[in-house]
Amino acid sequence: MRIFYLILCFICLCDLLHAQTVRISYEGDPLTDKERRKIEQTLQYEVEFYAQFGLPDTLNLQLTVFNKREDALVYLNKFNIHPPKSTNGMYISRLQKAIILSREKEYQQGLGVIYHELSHHLTLQITAGRPPIWFNEGLAEYFEHCKV
């Protein structure tokens, strides 16, 4: 019986050592607690998917959300970034930040853009920063429209 408990403890310890730790820091305009919970729930789903392909055990993500596009443009100008007018969100790999330029009027669509941009960060983690565009955008589109 002791051997059984010893083996069980060893298995549990090994499982803990391989657990994903994801820290997300929020910047910009505040999100509601409900929005944060939804984002973190979907992010956990994304992490479980990407973990199958060698996602690092510890990740730090930065999400910056702006309610007004004008505020986002002023912020991005500091980094000499000038997005196209049709862009609602972007992932900037050199800053490792997902930036939402303006909140969508429709709640779910706005969250979808966030899921899309966070997916870019995770894809870059498993491909050493050089994914084919079709692969990067394909996964981001998939997660943008996922219902968890």
Question: What feature does the model see in each segment?
Answer:
Residues 11, 46, 79, 146-147:
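Alpha-helix boundary/capping residues
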Residues 14, 51, 147-148:
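Proteins with a high burden of low-complexity, intrinsically disordered sequence enriched in S/T/G/P/A and R
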Residues 15-19:
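Sec/Tat signal peptide C-region and signal peptidase I cleavage site
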Residues 20-132:
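Juxtacatalytic substrate-recognition/specificity segment
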